[in-house]
UniProtKB/Swiss-Prot annotation:
NCBIfam families reported in the protein's UniProt record: PRK10958.1
GO BP annotations, alphabetical order: L-leucine transport
Organism lineage string: Bacteria, Pseudomonadati, Pseudomonadota, Gammaproteobacteria, Enterobacterales
Subcellular localization: Cell inner membrane
Superkingdom per UniProt: Bacteria
Protein name per its UniProtKB record: Leucine efflux protein
Known catalytic reactions: L-leucine(in) + H(+)(out) = L-leucine(out) + H(+)(in)
Biological source species: Enterobacter sp. (strain 638)
Family from the record: Belongs to the Rht family.
Keyword entries, A-Z: Amino-acid transport, Antiport, Cell inner membrane, Cell membrane, Membrane, Transmembrane, Transmembrane helix, Transport
Major location category of this protein: membrane
A single MF term (Gene Ontology): antiporter activity
Membrane-related topology note: Multi-pass membrane protein
Length: 211
């Protein structure tokens, strides 16, 4: 399928992309958190930021920016540390709200839509490993002798975004379901927010330690 467009082993790619999307990360965690704290509509808003960020990174990978980042350690480190600091800030903010007894699932209901979109977009764009991953993963399924590899890249990118959309939808509706349960379980809600905050801090440490 899509072999005429320079795509190799498409269904193998789909299976690989599916399992890659399932790997927990700051983006999926933020979408789940938003779904729990703000409902379906804002959950999809957070997911939109992730989709836009991933689309930008995939385009940059195709345009050759990945090679520039890979061969320029200073540029790689700048993006890496900015991403780590941002994750640390998000995690610290959540932990502080738990300490101050502010349940984000209730008190955070008035958070502006623009803030949610910006946060999810920044989370996607400040991960230098993502753009390098797109190149290393996509190249395995592109026929380099094809007339237009841009079309091949577009097919693979669109497929990945569709798989991501389905998984994000599952997270968002799961989050909305959890919200209804947590309305009567305030201590459990605080514990959940604290754990998510700690996970963000952990993601920050992992990103900062990447080489």
């Amino acid at each position: 399928m899509f072999a005429e467009f320079g795509v190799l082993n498409f269904w193998t790619y789909v299976v690989g992309a599916f399992f890659i999307v399932l790997v927990p990360g700051p983006n999926t965690l933020f979408v789940l958190k938003t779904g729990i704290g703000h409902g379906v509509k804002k959950g999809y808003l957070a997911a939109t930021g992730v989709f836009i960020g991933d689309a930008v990174l995939m385009f940059l990978a195709w345009a050759g920016v990945a090679a520039l980042i890979q061969t320029t350690p200073v540029l790689f480190n700048i993006v890496r540390y900015l991403g780590a600091l941002y994750l640390l800030w998000l995690g610290g903010k959540m932990l502080w709200s738990v300490i101050m007894r502010k349940n984000s699932a209730h008190a955070g209901g008035a958070e502006p839509s623009s803030t949610i979109l910006k946060r999810s977009l920044v989370l996607s764009l400040t991960n230098p490993k993502a753009i390098l991953f797109y190149v290393s993963f996509f190249v395995q399924f592109i026929d380099v002798s094809a007339t237009n590899t841009g079309t091949s890249f577009l097919i693979l990118a669109t497929t990945l975004e569709l798989i991501s959309f389905m998984y994000m939808s599952f997270l968002i509706f799961s989050g909305a379901f959890v919200t209804r349960y947590l309305k009567t379980k305030k201590k459990l809600a605080k514990l959940g927010n604290g754990l998510i905050g700690l996970l963000f801090v952990g993601f920050a440490a992992r990103l900062a330690s990447l080489h």
